[in-house]
Amino acid sequence: TVSHATAIEAALLGRMGLAELGEKTLGPLAMEHGAQLKANHTLDLCRAALMFEGIEAPRGREEMVKAALSTYSLPTALGNLANKVLLDAYTESPATWRAFCAIRSTSDFKKNTAIRPSFTTPLERVGTDGELKHGTVGEWFSEYQVDTFGKMLSIDRRDLINDDLSVFDETARALGRAAMRRVSDLVYEVLLANAGNFFSAGNGNYLTGADSALSFDGLAKAIEAMMLQRDDEGNDLDLRPATLLVPPQLQTTAKALLESEFIQQIVERTPTGNSLRRAVSVEIEPRLSNTEKFGNKASAKHWYLFASPSAVPMVVAFLEGKQTPTVEYFGLDHQANKLAVTWRVYHDFGTALVDPRAAVRSKGEA
């Protein structure tokens, strides 16, 4: 069976030209029930919400809208609609950080510790007595904390009276995109800040000088630096580079390095096979060179190499594992000075640098 609120939600999706999203999230049966309401105007859905609850619809438009927004069905449908549209925009927004950040769940807003154990002694041959020797475990750790980020979303009663749901759609989508942008902003703010000299010569993960520019030799050097990372006792960590992260200014160079079948040798000036072809995937991130937002920490020349998220170069944590924003309904009377229904949109997340051995930064210039 399809609930009254779901039928109204399906009809709203149809009215907004989002039938495909409705089919995907509610299913064909719900969309069919929505179509059966034959809603040619948003006021028809207000009337349906009142009818579902056995309330006679007032004759005046404003009175009808106000009465409908006091029912269960219409506010629930609008809230679910806001959630779906917002999350649709959120999931479609670029998130380059997912290529190299481990995802974690935290149960509170306290400081949490991201620990990456490092077994500093290899497995040893078991003797005839069957005794297994104890090894030692070292740890790389970093602290992270989840914070709350949010905004309010409102739909004025006049938009319902005027059958104008485009503002609602555009606002919800804008909030969805803004939510993902805020996560990305925080990730790259932390990455570029380089707290605790995460990228440094001492950690073997920071390349400088003219030969650190993105080139065949520069990328080969970064790959080598990561693959040569060892623990405190000299054991190889077997890290494998997975993602090359570059600003838009370096995307052509990056794609040429990783996609071309041949490269031009400088000395002989003859093409030769490209041994770096498809060595890693490439991600283009405009925040890396956004000096307006990140000041002199941003650059059009620097670039990064990361191992896979399982190696935990960085962590992004979400409260109780909820990776998407939360949408809460507040009703028509939430603000006495404003005749509008309001939703609160908020997102709880945090991020931190964790294991410097799983990342390399190249300055890209002398």
Q: Model features per residue range: what roles?
A:
Residues 35-50, 61-68, 72-75, 79-81, ...:
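A conserved ligand/cofactor-binding region detector
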Residues 209-213, 217-228, 242-243, 249-366:
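Sequence/fold signature of self-assembling virion shell proteins
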Residues 149-151, 242:
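Short amphipathic alpha-helical segments
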Residues 151, 155-230, 275, 283-287:
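Alpha-helical scaffold segments that mediate packing/assembly in large oligomeric complexes
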Residues 192-196, 240-247:
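A glycine-rich phosphate-binding loop feature that marks nucleotide/adenosyl-phosphate handling sites
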Residues 232, 237-241:
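Short gly/pro-enriched beta-turn/loop segments at secondary-structure junctions
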